[in-house]
């Protein structure tokens, strides 16, 4: 029997592992296991991305599963602002989260993250904050480090080698069930039928495992609450248009309230000189973006997302988001790309029209089309209104050279109800990260794993 079993080797699981490793090296007699359905980070390969093809729908998606989780293939932004990247402050309080993020940052630095900080210059932030306000936008403080996808994978690989010195890691092993006896967790069962017993279990399956975790919570009688689903587009344009603000802040976090519908709209995942990519969630293909530390493109991309909150009797926002995404898949066999200029003038984009613009699409297999056949009028209106506001902040956004890809969707899992220690109503069962609906990014996910690990150590009588 293990003292602790961690399901998921993404940022939450890894940082929980680091905290347990620290306890072991301080003399605690702890046996711990990290389990993940995917392979080691250096063995993770996306055939579709490498060959420039449409998603192959592999049984185990290497973009989301394996050591490092989705974070290994992300843009590698280490966000240090407690207001960005999730809802952990509601669990821990602002000061505790700030401390956790600082400790997360120190570990990243130890394993090779760059020392350069973006967004820490108060004077530049205030300048852009005033300019944003004049354009009806709100700029959020977002202090971060940028690793890029290439360096992110290297850092995760070094972490793998370090954790294995004290913690057992079992990859290519899928957990299918969480086990309990009465009101206490007893372990997990793998797809191969192996029952792994543990005194405490931390479940951190990432967004890829969100639906599975929701099913497990239902069978275990654990309450969950609904998070919103964010739907929108990935915007791609010449990097020079955004350079004045991205050179200062790297990733400006901008919020907007639409005039027509009073809906919240925001920028997300800004990638200066990056590329647009696809990702796969269950049975739908969606769009995303990233950038490398090396290998820069002439384009910048970012998402514009509209938060969709649903009330009774509707209880399945994730299915709604997938429904909209499937419309794009149906019309294009994947992702639709449209010039903003064509959208504003009520016409579909064609290969010929795309070729007239200065922006060469970095997602080569996107199909030129018409996003108005995909998005509800309300969401499309929200997006267009924010693009026009952004054009006042960075002139040139509303132009013939701006491309819109759809659909970008962020399926923020149903939030698992926990106490302040991230323990569920089943004693000994803890949750963390994006898959539990607590976070939506690399840093807060890692912080949640660290917080959960310290709670587990305390519950087992270790310090």
Residues covered by each model-derived region:
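Dinucleotide-binding Rossmann-like beta1-alpha1 core, especially the glycine-rich loop
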Residues: 58, 65-118
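Residues forming the flavin
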Residues: 2-82, 123-130, 135-463
């Amino acid at each position: 029997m293990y003292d602790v079993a961690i399901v998921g080797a993404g940022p939450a699981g890894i940082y929980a592992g680091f905290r347990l490793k620290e306890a072991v090296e301080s003399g605690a007699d702890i046996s711990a296991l990290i389990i993940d359905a995917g392979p080691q980070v250096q063995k993770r390969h996306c055939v579709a991305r490498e060959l420039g093809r449409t998603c192959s729908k592999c049984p185990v998606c290497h973009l989301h599963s394996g050591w490092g989780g989705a974070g290994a293939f992300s843009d590698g932004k280490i966000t240090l602002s407690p207001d960005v990247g999730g809802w952990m402050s509601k669990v821990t309080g602002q000061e505790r989260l700030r401390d956790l993020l600082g400790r997360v940052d120190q570990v990243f630095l130890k394993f090779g993250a760059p020392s350069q900080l973006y967004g820490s210059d108060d004077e530049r932030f205030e300048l852009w904050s005033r300019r944003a306000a004049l354009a009806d936008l709100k700029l959020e403080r977002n202090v971060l480090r940028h690793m890029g996808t290439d360096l992110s994978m290297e850092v995760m690989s070094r972490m793998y080698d370090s954790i294995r010195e004290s913690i057992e890691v079992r990859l290519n092993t899928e957990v299918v069930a969480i086990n309990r006896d009465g009101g206490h967790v007893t372990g997990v069962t793998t797809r191969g039928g192996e029952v792994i017993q543990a005194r405490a279990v931390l479940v951190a399956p990432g967004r890829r495992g969100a639906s599975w975790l929701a099913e497990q919570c239902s069978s275990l009688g654990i309450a969950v609450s609904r998070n919103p689903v964010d739907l929108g587009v990935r915007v791609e344009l010449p990097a020079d248009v955004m350079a004045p603000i991205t050179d200062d802040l790297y990733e400006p976090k901008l919020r907007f309230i639409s005039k027509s519908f009073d809906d919240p709209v925001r920028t997300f995942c800004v990638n200066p000189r990056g590329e647009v990519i696809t990702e796969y969630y269950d049975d739908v293909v969606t769009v995303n973006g990233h950038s490398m530390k090396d290998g820069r493109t002439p384009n910048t991309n970012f998402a514009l997302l509209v938060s969709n909150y649903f009330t009774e009797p509707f209880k399945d926002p994730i299915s709604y988001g997938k429904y909209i995404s499937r419309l794009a898949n149906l019309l294009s066999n994947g992702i639709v790309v449209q010039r903003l200029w064509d959208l504003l003038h009520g016409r579909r984009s064609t290969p010929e029209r795309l070729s007239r613009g200065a922006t060469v699409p970095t997602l080569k297999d996107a199909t030129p089309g018409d996003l108005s056949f995909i998005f509800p009028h309300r969401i499309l209106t929200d997006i267009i209104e924010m693009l026009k506001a952004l054009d006042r902040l960075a002139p040139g956004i509303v132009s013939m050279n701006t491309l819109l890809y759809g659909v970008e969707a962020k399926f923020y899992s149903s939030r698992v109800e926990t106490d302040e220690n991230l323990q569920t109503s089943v004693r000994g069962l803890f949750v963390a990260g994006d898959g539990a609906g607590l976070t939506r990014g690399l840093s807060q996910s890692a912080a949640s794993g660290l917080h959960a690990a310290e709670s587990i150590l305390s519950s087992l009588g270790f310090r």
